[in-house]
Amino acid sequence: MKTSAVLFFVTLFLVVSVVAGCAPAGQSQATAAPVVTTKTYADLTLCYPQLGAESDWRTANTASIKETAEKLGIKQLVFSDAQQKQENQIAAVRACIAQKVDVIALPPVVEDGWDAALTEAKNAGIPVIIVDRSVSADPSLYAAHIGSNMVLEGERAAAEFNKMLPNGGAVLELSGTTGSGAAVGRAKGFRNKLNPNIKILDSQTGNFTRAEAVPVMQAFLKKYKPGQDFQGVFIHNDDMGIGAIEALKAAGVNPGDLKIVSVDGTRGGFQAMVDGWFQADVECNPLLGPQVFDMALKLVNGGAVDRETLTNETVYYPDKATDLLPTRQY
């Protein structure tokens, strides 16, 4: 009986020991599991190699990025100005890769020539967001694009000329930086939708700047008579539009003599509508800061993002320009 009792208690001890040895295993595993930490804006380092400061639009875009970074309290914004030179942008991207930033948000000055730099960023494990303009590189080399539908902007401009010149005519085109996504897209959209009875008489680049648009418009006016040889001008951004107005004024052209459609929707563009120079201004919103930082934080935390995020935009007209001008943020 004693032997049986001893065997019973020994057996019971062993069973309890085995159970006790197994039961905490799950608890130990849970305790030892790596803790997943979610990064916040305070942990985020973002590189923004801005393409330049060529226009009011670009100035507003820079302000949106900087102001949003400050408001969100991000760890570091690595900002640079490439002065509209791709080689400067590429150098800035490579410097950010060497610095091991979390995300690169790139507003490319032109579409082509980005494969090498984007490949380097991808190999370094740094996601790249293409901002504003587009690139021709393999989409697998960057995480997403945030910006405007430049082709649609050109199509909207064409629709305005189709309405204003129902019997046909001829227009001039002041285009943006050669090879840039904005210039390529707007030119393509414009040609997609322009009625066949409206001829594009001539097209020259003003490089998206007010200063360069003046001599281009002056050269146009030496070759073609306003109202006779051409009835309208499609201008790829408001800064060039303001430069064109300067040349038109000097040549004795008055507001309303020509049909002018611009792109951007800046304060300068609204003033040109108020003054009777622009008949329409196709919106292109530069205030992309909140969207850029929201997407950047999702990317560093492994979240899914949309490959293409297009801003919601419209077309503005002179009849509302006076009322809306004081409310414009850029």
Where are these regions (language model features)?
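Short, solvent-exposed amphipathic alpha-helices that sit
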Residues: 57-72, 153-157, 181-199, 212-216, ...
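Short beta-strand elements at the ligand-binding edges of bilobed clamshell
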Residues: 79-81, 137-160, 173-177, 203, ...
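Hydrophobic alpha-helical
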Residues: 106-122, 190, 202, 207-271
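Hydrophobic alpha-helical segments within soluble ligand-binding/sensing domains
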Residues: 39-41, 89, 145-171, 184, ...
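Hinge/cleft segment of the Venus flytrap/periplasmic-binding protein
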Residues: 29-44, 174, 178-182, 192-197, ...
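Flexible loop/hinge segments that line or gate small-molecule binding clefts
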Residues: 112-152, 170, 266-274, 325-326
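Extracytoplasmic "Venus flytrap"
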Residues: 35-64, 68, 72, 77-95, ...
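Short, low-complexity disordered leader/linker segments with a strong preference
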Residues: 1-44, 70-71, 119-126, 323, ...
